């Protein structure tokens, strides 16, 4: 492959990958693809476009820039089973960044996202959705998702980053990421507008979107309709209350996730459960001392 990425943010979905992407875009000498998430190695229909299409995403990069992309589909097993083999085949040596957050909170944000995208039906609450959409739990099973990457690329090429510590000490975590990818300069955290916030997303509606985003309409809307009125209208299309798991479902899901976290914690050298996750994450485990191949 010509000019392959030097690094890839591989997930997890709803774990601040967009924020990290934006911060890396803001650093001189780092080139990130547009779109943020090519999903080339995961999605069959995109992979079918061929390597030249993917190479073209990096064509605008300056010759001496570090090149990266950020596709959260790359850690969505079992949905996309061919991802790792494709990365190995076409990219070879690459640095991988895996962002994680409290798995129950990630699950809830994932549910909201899928609700806004109409993947989950309007009247399907989060408890019913767990059985109909097992990916809500699967994508929060971090050890299951990251194990094949550790096996394929080695722990020295996979950086664990925790959402909680990323929010708590952003400059420190940005420096850690940049050191990992081989960035030769001192990165500076930028105060940027938050993007991809699930609670602010409106549920998709084809007719509404066709009218609202028609050429010229957006400018008229912003100039003639007060912001307060626009926000009131948007709220009609947003989830009004953050969903909560029922007691029985929370207990069931916690048991599944705790089993997965026990394995993840063993590799990271910290005790991890749903109950201890936030505290442990802020100790910022930086490597994989418990990985058996070390």
What is each model feature region?
Residues 1-294:
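Anion-recognition interface
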């Amino acid at each position: 492959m010509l000019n392959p990425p030097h690094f890839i943010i591989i997930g997890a979905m709803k774990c601040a990958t967009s924020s990290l992407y934006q911060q890396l875009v803001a650093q001189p000498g780092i080139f990130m693809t547009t779109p943020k998430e090519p999903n080339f190695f995961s999605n069959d229909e995109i992979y079918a476009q061929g390597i030249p299409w993917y190479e073209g995403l990096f064509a605008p990069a300056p010759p001496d820039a570090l090149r990266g992309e950020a596709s959260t589909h790359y850690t969505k097993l079992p949905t996309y089973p061919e991802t790792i083999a494709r990365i190995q085949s076409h990219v070879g040596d690459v640095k991988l960044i895996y962002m994680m957050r409290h798995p129950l909170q990630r699950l809830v944000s994932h549910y909201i996202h899928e609700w806004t995208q109409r993947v989950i039906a309007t009247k399907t609450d989060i408890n019913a959705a767990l059985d109909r959409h097992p990916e809500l739990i699967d994508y929060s099973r971090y050890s299951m998702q990251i194990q094949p990457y550790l096996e394929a690329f080695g722990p020295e090429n996979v950086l664990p980053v925790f959402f909680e510590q990323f929010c708590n000490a952003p400059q420190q975590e940005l420096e850690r990421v940049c050191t990992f990818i081989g960035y030769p300069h001192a990165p500076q955290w930028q105060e940027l507008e938050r993007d991809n916030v699930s609670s602010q997303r409106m549920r998709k509606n084809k007719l509404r979107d066709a009218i609202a985003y028609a050429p010229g309409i957006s400018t008229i809307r912003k100039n003639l309709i007060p912001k307060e009125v626009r926000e009131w209208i948007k709220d009609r299309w947003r989830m009004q209350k953050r969903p909560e798991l029922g007691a029985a479902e929370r207990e069931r899901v916690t048991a599944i996730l705790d089993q997965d976290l026990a394995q993840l914690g063993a590799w990271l050298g910290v005790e991890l459960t749903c109950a201890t996750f936030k505290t442990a994450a802020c100790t910022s485990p930086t490597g994989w001392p418990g990985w058996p191949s070390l």
